[in-house]
Amino acid sequence: MNPEKFILELSKHNFVLTDKQKEQFKLYFKFLIEVNEHVNLTRITEENEVYLKHFYDSITPLFVFGDVFKDGATLCDVGAGAGFPSIPLKILKPSLKVTIVDSLAKRLTFLKDLIAKLGLDNVELVHGRAEDVGQNKLYREKFDIVTARAVAKMSVLSEYCLPLVKKDGYFVALKGPKAEDELDEGKKALAVLGGKLIKDEELTLPGTTEERTLVLVKKVKETSKKYPRQAGTPRRKPIC
């Protein structure tokens, strides 16, 4: 998917990019590849692949769960790495107020420089483990939307993300193909943490056979104060 095809595909979903947005994606790609030479940010480095598997993939929730991403909504991205999905979402929806949580300082340095280059405002970077941030009263149950892409399986991911979602807010997980087993396995964790599965939708990346699953969870009750547990525990002993 070259930049022109990317622009065309977005227009099919009623997203017509401005010149500024086109330039932001172009700068994003260039800076990602430049920094990736000395900081391990991504294995995907070819332009067509970055536009498809990072940029397009990151914004698919806007096509499927568009009503969730209201103007001015607060969004927390857990384990964003090189900024996916939150930075592409922010480029398309500039009114989003974004907080990015990541445990690696090198990635946050890249993101700080990227945000400046792209001229983005209302983006906060938080250095820490999701388990610790989820117990911090500055962030706990403060967000309308929490996103995570390719971070952990659903039973673990729910414990990272749901404590950050405010009641009646949403957790959006960007998963790979055939996530049914993972969703079944994660049902108990969702219930324990105050979440309710609203929808899971499969889609195929344009021009490929690569499948993705988008998962929408609503926060229907507050999360018990005992969650998230100590850093490392959710991965070692998932709720199941």
Swiss-Prot record:
<dbReference type="Pfam" id="PF02527">
    <property type="entry name" value="GidB"/>
</dbReference>
<comment type="similarity">
    <text>Belongs to the methyltransferase superfamily. RNA methyltransferase RsmG family.</text>
</comment>
<feature type="binding site">
    <location>
        <begin position="130"/>
        <end position="131"/>
    </location>
    <ligand>
        <name>S-adenosyl-L-methionine</name>
    </ligand>
</feature>
<protein>
    <recommendedName>
        <fullName>Ribosomal RNA small subunit methyltransferase G</fullName>
        <ecNumber>2.1.1.-</ecNumber>
    </recommendedName>
</protein>
<dbReference type="GO" id="GO:0005829">
    <property type="term" value="C:cytosol"/>
</dbReference>
<comment type="function">
    <text>Specifically methylates the N7 position of a guanine in 16S rRNA.</text>
</comment>
<feature type="binding site">
    <location>
        <position position="149"/>
    </location>
    <ligand>
        <name>S-adenosyl-L-methionine</name>
    </ligand>
</feature>
<dbReference type="InterPro" id="IPR003682">
    <property type="entry name" value="rRNA_ssu_MeTfrase_G"/>
</dbReference>
<dbReference type="InterPro" id="IPR029063">
    <property type="entry name" value="SAM-dependent_MTases_sf"/>
</dbReference>
<keyword id="KW-0949">S-adenosyl-L-methionine</keyword>
<keyword id="KW-0489">Methyltransferase</keyword>
<keyword id="KW-0808">Transferase</keyword>
<keyword id="KW-0963">Cytoplasm</keyword>
<feature type="binding site">
    <location>
        <position position="79"/>
    </location>
    <ligand>
        <name>S-adenosyl-L-methionine</name>
    </ligand>
</feature>
<feature type="binding site">
    <location>
        <position position="84"/>
    </location>
    <ligand>
        <name>S-adenosyl-L-methionine</name>
    </ligand>
</feature>
<keyword id="KW-0698">rRNA processing</keyword>
<dbReference type="GO" id="GO:0070043">
    <property type="term" value="F:rRNA (guanine-N7-)-methyltransferase activity"/>
</dbReference>
